[in-house]
Amino acid sequence: MEAARILVVGAGLAGLALARSLRQAGFAPELIERADRWDIAGTGMYLPANGVRALRALGLQDAVAARASDIPRQRVLDHRGRVLVDADMHQFWGGIGPCLALPRSELHQLLREGVPVRMGRTVRSLERPDGPVGVTFDDGSGAEFDLVVGADGLRSTVRRLAVDRRPPIPVGQQSWRFLAARPAEVTTWTVLLGRGTSFLSIPVGPGLVYCYADVTTGRAGGAAPNGDPVGQLRRRFAGFAAPVPGLLEQLDDPAKVHVAPIEQVAEERWGRGAVLLAGDAAHGMSPNMAQGGSLAFEDALVLAACLRDAGTISDAVAAFVARRSPRTAWVRAQTHRRDRTRNLPPFLRDLVLRSFGQRIFRSHYRPLLDPV
């Protein structure tokens, strides 16, 4: 199996992790990326300890930790700053590892070190998905591969060509993301909840804080709003307690705010024959469990192990899907449960979180304590 011809499409977090894991297992995958240069969004990444555990297996935990903030607690407040939930991350995750947060660009840089990537190339068509897969690239050239893995994100070309033509669907939330200078009071993961709104701030290394804000729009509200995102944020989150006013006051350039609807894949699908999906291409979902990167890193480790241990590509693919599907389906279900809780009337939501927030947190994350 080490001689298997493997194409990985997409050099985001999922594709880079997969290429790295495959190389560790003795394979020589070809990794291609549509973009002709790196242009990583100026946002942040929060990695719960199961994701950090996966990075440890990829040989990157120490390098990531050196650039990241350790996140000791998750605090949920109402919009006036009153505590609803205060969960101890070190106590919950125990020896599995720390929870870390850092700029997305720095995590991407660490993942791509030592991993060859062919830039400015993508897939135009896929033939014989049962294998060997005939691939035509966007420059008209072609090649055959024993396995093609689409790790090309929520709007995956590989998914559209071979697995599921349906586009992602909105979950009913609009998001704004940006980085800001870190005020002294931002020491850990902290979210403030309003009526149909939330504002999250996370330290992401020395001097920086990652801010994520969203508003519930309803299922039809998939399009990004027009206009000035800075003004939108200031209007939507007027009246929120610290640190929100100070963070919004820092914003002086609308181009630094990344605005997008929150979307998920129409249905969790893993592939067709020797065309496989990984990361968001397979199971993209709402970010409210902060598991997008972590699940992608776990996918990378499990797929490499299945290919190493199986006798055939089809056996490896079947083993991979059997191991990953229950875990990713669980996380997807929890994102829906969390959305239902946050969309309760504020007085009822706050009562539920004050009374049962710790129990809810543990129930949502407990299965992720188990190794992959």
What does each model-identified segment do?
Residues 1-6, 48-179, 218-234, 263, ...:
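Conserved N-terminal helical subregion
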Residues 2-4, 66, 246, 289-290, ...:
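C-terminal helical "tail/cap" subdomain of flavin- and related membrane-associated enzymes
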Residues 8-35, 149-150, 176, 233, ...:
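Conserved mid-domain beta->alpha element of the FAD-binding
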Residues 27, 60, 242:
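Short phosphate-binding/catalytic loops that engage adenosine nucleotides
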Residues 117, 131-133, 192-193, 238, ...:
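Short gly/ser/thr-rich secondary-structure transition/capping motifs
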Residues 156, 175-177, 197-200, 282-283:
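Histidine-centered metal-chelating micro-motifs
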Residues 189-221, 237-240:
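Active-site substrate-recognition segment that forms the wall
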Residues 223-256:
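Flavin-binding catalytic cores
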